[in-house]
Amino acid sequence: MIRVGLVGIGNCASALLQGLEYYGNAEHNNSLRGLTETFIGPYPITSVEVVLAFDVDKRKVNRPLEEAIYAGNNCCYTMVPRIYNSVKVLCAPILDGVSEHMKDSFCPESSPVAESPEAMAQILTEAKLDVLVNYLPVGSEQATKFWAETCVLAKVAMMNCIPVFIASDPVYADKFREAGVPLIGDDIKSQFGASIVSQVLEELAIDRGHTVVYHVQQNTGGNTDFKNMLNQSRLVSKKISKENVIRSQHALRGEHAPFVHAGPSDYVEVYGDTKICQLDLELKGFGGAPVHLDLKLRVQDSPNSAGVVIDGIRYLKLAQDKGLAGPLDVSSFLCKHPPTATRFGQAKALARSVASDL
């Protein structure tokens, strides 16, 4: 089994835990639809086991995961009637993990089980953890670095799902490499979300000889992720990360990027975990003839993320088995802001070869 810890028991954690229950059920396990990879190396999805969990919300701390994923403001799409996981949620240090305007929503608890990376590393070691998944809110710079330091000390692989740059920061990349610890990051690129659709459309336009005049991506949602992002001061790295997906396709071809705008545009509570993306692209084709693309994408935000995280966990465990350390190359397939960007086809081929253990 792959022993996993989760930092942040919000909608994304709920989707991952529900997905483990869903695919662990024989009725659904037969088809395994909805997964990018059935096996990664020797590991099926059923090899993943969540054994440690952290949050700062009083409504989740000290409750079993099977209750905590439905507590507070969680509004994830329901995949299964319930999950069966009695692991108790531990209190994490808050640091900058809760935006000022979110304190009433999160009901933060201020009695963490450990306050230093050294003390927290001991907890991870005692739990015999293989992989830690960072699900902190966007803008949690100090908190993410706290957990990165903890993973280095505990020699636990880290999956950084948010746009705080760890894998793509040479300083942290070296820390993980020197400690012999694998790392995937930064900022999860959902299975079929705004970023991957933007990337593929940008690639298609370029490869079919078109000039991209502008590429505008606007996203609206009603979960706590979107509410948190109402605080513009927490969005600097998020905007860099989302726009990197588009701009990097021009950089790879030695071209100047067009006008690009990508990021959250509004929080609408009634949408819940539904995310609505509006894409607006203007191109110039043969003879300078204009092409205009308007596209609307509506997805369940958190399951869209979980479908990638479940692969990342297994890639990290496979890397541990092989003695690999530092940022993994599959980050280019799984994340918006990897250390090295690639074209979609190249990233997919690399991920497929690793999953096949070639």
Give the role of each language-model region.
Residues 138-153, 161-182:
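Rossmann-fold NAD(P)-binding glycine/threonine-rich loop
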Residues 173-175, 180-210, 216-220, 290-330:
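Adenosine-phosphate binding glycine-rich loop
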Residues 10, 54-58, 190-192, 217-224, ...:
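Glycine-rich beta-alpha junction loops
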Residues 132-134, 158-161, 184-187, 215:
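Short catalytic-loop micro-motif centered on adjacent basic/acidic residues
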Residues 260-276:
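Structured beta-strand/loop patches that form or line metal/cofactor-binding pockets in enzymes
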Residues 7, 184-256:
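Conserved anion/nucleotide-ligand pocket segment
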Residues 37, 275-358:
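C-terminal active-site/capping subdomain that shapes the small-molecule cofactor and substrate pocket
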